[in-house]
């Protein structure tokens, strides 16, 4: 039996504490807020898309950074295992197959997930310390034999120091403090500095799943217009990246599920240079089919012919840009028709940044996976120190994948202590 300290009461920290407690360990969960799961509470607009119903092998394609690192985590505690766990706790859920196979609570309430986990922590005698911030970890030097049987200097975790000066000693420590996104929920990134001071490498932090700012000023006129099932693509180092989904025009640029996913693939590039985005608003129709729609009723205004397949206010702005507002289909030249189709099938927008790391849903970057044993989540530098979730340099697309990463890495670290 070991004394295990878990730092951070988010999704991964709660799961780590639960799985650690099942090995008859004494578990202490330290949370800086007055409640557990504050970021989890806001997930999916409060609906809590806690996992995805795709096959677990399909999850790797949705991981943006360091997908191979997650092999042991995903297979130790799969999405089906997570769903079964919540089922066993009588949490009702629903699978929205038409919505990218996302899994939500039946009542669209994230608080239900938190309540299940909280109750289970109590049932497993996990001691929860609220409103306590860890400001350092306690280590001591030790030695272990290397491959050539020579003594090698290593560090051993001994506990943590709280902001009031108290020291809590333990045999194992699990770091589940998250990234820097949504800092108002308590994840301010202070643990990164602590870990750096103890020798760990911090890979640069970037905003992920974040809205994109657009250089073109006229886009403000489209503010508030929502577009369904668009395809956004760009070229990064000669490789085409393409994502499909809904998007929303905003005063600063563009947002929505499709945009957020794309942001995770270009966030590092747009720190250095602008990125040209190509947007196809009707990916299921080719140019000839759109041409037929434009000219469907010759004596009608172009907008009237297209409003069944595109939002009317979107069409008004596009046609205004082309000075074709009130033109009838019969009066439209072939050149102008091609221009309209080009705007619909291949609108070019210049992305010049994001709305910032605090507005991202998750943090890209974090503690280097090279310094963590992926089979156990244990630090390779400090014995008996473990990591979970967003504090590690791993992130994924929207759709429940990031929460599954949190639960899976939390579970694996907990059973490994």
Spell out what each predicted region is:
Residues 129-131, 316-395:
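A glycine-rich dinucleotide-binding beta-alpha-beta segment and adjacent secondary-structure elements
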Residues 76-172:
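Feature captures the FAD/FMN-dependent oxidoreductase FAD-binding
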Residues 3-29, 413-417:
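N-terminal Rossmann-like FAD-binding beta1-loop-alpha1 element of flavoenzymes
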Residues 47-97:
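Glycine-rich active-site loop/strand segments that organize a redox cofactor
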Residues 5-7, 30, 134, 167-181, ...:
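Short hydrophobic core segments
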Residues 172-218:
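Glycine-rich loop(s) and the adjacent beta-strand/alpha-helix scaffold that form part
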Residues 34-42, 50, 56-57, 92, ...:
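An anion/pyrophosphate-binding glycine-rich loop and adjacent beta-alpha core
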Residues 21-45:
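Glycine-rich FAD pyrophosphate-binding loop
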């Amino acid at each position: 039996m070991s004394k295990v300290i878990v730092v951070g009461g988010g999704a991964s920290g709660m799961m780590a504490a639960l799985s650690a407690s099942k090995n008859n360990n004494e578990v202490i969960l330290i949370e800086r807020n007055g409640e557990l799961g504050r970021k989890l509470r806001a997930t999916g607009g409060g609906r809590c898309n806690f996992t995805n119903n795709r096959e677990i092998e399909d999850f790797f394609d949705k991981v943006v950074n360091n997908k191979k690192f997650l092999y042991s985590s995903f297979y130790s505690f799969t999405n089906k295992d997570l769903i079964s766990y919540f089922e066993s706790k009588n949490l009702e859920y629903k699978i929205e197959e038409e919505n990218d196979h996302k899994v939500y609570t039946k009542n669209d309430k994230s608080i239900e997930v938190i309540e299940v986990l909280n109750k289970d922590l109590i049932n497993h005698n996990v001691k929860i310390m609220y409103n306590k911030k860890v400001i350092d970890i306690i280590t001591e030097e030790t030695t272990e034999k290397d491959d050539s049987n020579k003594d090698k200097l290593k560090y051993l975790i001994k506990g943590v120091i709280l902001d009031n000066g108290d020291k809590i000693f333990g045999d194992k420590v699990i770091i589940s403090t998250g990234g820097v996104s949504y800092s108002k929920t308590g994840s301010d990134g202070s643990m990164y500095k602590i870990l750096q001071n103890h020798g760990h490498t911090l890979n640069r932090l970037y905003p992920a799943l974040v809205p994109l700012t657009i250089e073109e000023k006229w886009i403000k006129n489209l503010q508030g217009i929502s577009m369904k099932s668009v395809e956004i693509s760009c070229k990064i180092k000669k490789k085409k990246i393409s994502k499909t989904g809904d998007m929303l025009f905003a005063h600063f640029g563009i947002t929505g599920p499709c945009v957020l996913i794309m942001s995770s693939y270009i966030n590092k590039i747009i720190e250095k240079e602008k990125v040209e985005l190509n947007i196809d608003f009707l990916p299921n129709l080719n140019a000839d089919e759109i041409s037929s729609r434009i000219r469907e009723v010759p004596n009608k205004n172009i907008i009237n012919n297209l409003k069944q397949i595109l939002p009317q206010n979107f069409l008004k702005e596009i046609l205004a840009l082309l000075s074709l507002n009130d033109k009838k289909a019969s009066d439209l030249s072939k050149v102008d028709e091609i221009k309209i189709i080009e705007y619909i099938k291949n609108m070019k927008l210049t992305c010049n940044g994001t709305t910032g790391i605090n507005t991202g849903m998750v943090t890209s970057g974090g503690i280097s996976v090279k310094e963590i044993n992926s089979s156990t989540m244990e630090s390779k530098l400090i014995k008996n120190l473990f990591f979970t979730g967003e504090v590690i340099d791993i992130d994924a697309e929207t759709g429940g994948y990031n929460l599954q990463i949190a639960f899976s890495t939390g579970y694996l670290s907990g059973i490994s202590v």
